Regions:
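Mature catalytic core of soluble alpha/beta enzymes
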Residues: 1-235
Length: 236
């Protein structure tokens, strides 16, 4: 395979308490790709970052309703609903209460040591959300968290925009999106629990996405032992 792309000026960045990577095969489109990257990150932050008190999802969670929801919010809502349906409810945006009960109530970098786990309520599923699309009005009976699907959508959107000009790889927090033109070599993605490893398993991908997020890095201590950010909605 052609590994050269991984050596040509990748941009490494941090956002939402996670690391990220942007590789652009054609250097002349690097500035365009960086602009697209930060534009979509800012749009996602304004729409669905529950740690941003001014975001639309924070307003919805705080007030139980959201009026005049943006097109971006509906875009992320559609992605969350799609993930919910595809996983038969295992990827459930109504686990926000459970995440908070286990200590993930603030951005990962600010989770305190020794969290005391609170009691949790059953998740509600997508039925918790009522949407009037024509009026862009939503109500919810419980807090929502689109984190499981939002950053995956962000990397997909960035890759789709940049792919009109260059082969590209975008990664945020282990969610990877790639695109290549006809005849190009695939992107080679290494998957390792604790960062780059020479002997890590590798996946060759021409176009599409790979989810590599796990429970090994984003962990914290609680009175019930180590906790992580992946919640099973059947048990909380």
């Amino acid at each position: 395979g052609d590994f050269s792309r991984l050596l040509v000026g990748p941009l490494r960045f941090s956002v939402w308490g996670m690391s990220g990577t942007l590789h652009v095969a054609d250097d002349q489109w690097t500035s365009h790709a960086e602009a697209a990257l930060w534009q979509w990150i800012e749009r996602a932050d304004a729409a669905v970052n529950r740690f941003n008190p001014e975001s639309e999802i924070s307003r919805l969670n705080r007030d139980g309703e959201l009026t005049d929801a943006s097109e971006d919010f509906f875009r992320f809502l559609d992605a969350a609903r799609y993930a919910y349906d595809m996983t038969e409810g295992l990827c459930d945006p109504t686990v926000a209460n459970a995440l908070c009960a286990w200590g993930y109530a603030s951005d990962f970098d600010h989770i305190p040591d020794g969290v005391v786990v609170q009691s949790t309520r059953p998740t509600h599923g997508m039925g918790a959300l009522e949407v009037t699309v024509a009026e862009r009005y939503l109500t919810t009976c419980c807090p929502l968290d689109f984190g499981a699907s939002a950053k995956a959508l962000v990397v997909d959107l960035i890759a789709a925009e940049v792919s009109r000009h260059s082969d590209v790889l975008v990664e945020i927090g282990g969610d990877v999106a790639v695109s290549t033109t006809h005849g190009s070599s695939p992107w080679i993605i290494g998957v390792a629990p604790d960062g780059p490893e020479p002997t890590a398993p590798q996946i060759a991908v021409l176009s599409g996405g790979v989810a590599t997020s796990s429970t090994t890095l984003r962990t914290w201590a609680t009175d019930r032992g180590p906790a992580h950010h992946i919640i099973d909605p059947r048990t909380n």
